[in-house]
């Protein structure tokens, strides 16, 4: 009986579901020199319904930080930031951006720092690395519904080392564009991230877009998404298309000029906007705001297209020269812009402090009775309470500010403030002449070594031939010297074997003298007797 129970228990354990074991190639979080830091395995959870990947719970200095959700529009572009620890190992590592599936466990490389770009993403994807700042940025343009999916940005020689997963979504609505007609003298275009709350007089996540022309303004109640309101000269309410927004994503979606546009829902108040060339008085009730603008004839264009700004290669911002085109990725306050009221993009790439980047959302100051809304180190707007009723536009050109000021702040730590980040990278990143000089030794760089291999082989052959010729020459010279020496020895031996007469011994010399004939003797031959 006990044996039967044991067999039943063993059989039941064999039918139990096997526990999922981690894949061996996911055990390493990063390619550290000592290979001693193992990755702490987490649970499988989706960052979105489309992206299932094991998230890293490894909080070591090699962990990556960035946005988990990226949203864009069809035909637009998105910019993705991946922060990493600026250590000596990570600076020289390969940076990559890949797409998961199909199958789901394979991540196909789209672009990497080894000068590799997938053929399907040519001319519309770029990866820029900033080793000194611990950041690399990926920009994908010409978005389409086919780009929806899960992506990984990571560091390492393979696509399964140190990575961060994210989900890319494309909104269903079309991209918003400015009207094709030339703006009139009294037109003012404003777009903003965030919606106005009439109760607390503060901003909540969302996007409010307001297009106004003429002297009368109508508004639409603020919604958590993106609302668009157009006001005509007759003062009728014309609500535009509404599209969803993804607050707190930490990435940028390119659109038109964006600026804070508060929607007054409080008791009647008056606001005043002052600039060098235009003066507007804003009078509002619960449902309407009146805008009156006066401008001279030579300053009839009042839209914030920023066409008169100098282009800075350091920021890579494309500015549309025509009002009908989209102005890419601009975040700033509304202003009655003229030729003398142009924003300047500072040519520095110095990161701002985290406190400065967090100041991009308006906060209520009870002592002063005012709240401030601005972007990091760029433009600061001060909006007075109904008692003050004054808008003051000023530009804070701080020495530490730049369009890329919030790149060093971790996107995942900012939450909804990430929607107020600075202008995305459209062109080359970083100051000119300071490009990355990182040495890379990866499979894509083997072409240079293959080119140098034949040259080194030829040099080795030439050296070998020279050594052989030199050895033969030395051998011939040595052989000739030995031949001369042998000849000299033979001649000396011959002279010793055949001595002269004066060198013979005394007895032999006497015998030779005795055998010689006397001086008077002569030899005579006998005469023959001739016969008869």
UniProtKB/Swiss-Prot annotation:
Instruction: Provide this UniProt record's keywords sorted from A to Z.
Output: Adaptive immunity, Cell membrane, Disulfide bond, Glycoprotein, Immunity, Immunoglobulin domain, Membrane, Receptor, Signal, Transmembrane, Transmembrane helix
SUPFAM superfamilies recorded for this chain?
Immunoglobulin
**What are the boundaries of the signal sequence?**
1-16
What Pfam families does the database record attribute to this sequence? V-set
Keyword check for Signal: yes
Q: Which residues lie on this side of the membrane: Cytoplasmic?
A: 472-532
| Tissue spec | Expressed by mesangial cells.
Post-translational modification, as annotated: N-glycosylated.
UniProt subunit comment = Interacts with IGHM; this interaction facilitates the endocytosis of IgM-coated microbes or IgM-antigen immune complexes.
User: What is the protein's given name?
Assistant: High affinity immunoglobulin alpha and immunoglobulin mu Fc receptor
Gene name, per UniProt, is FCAMR
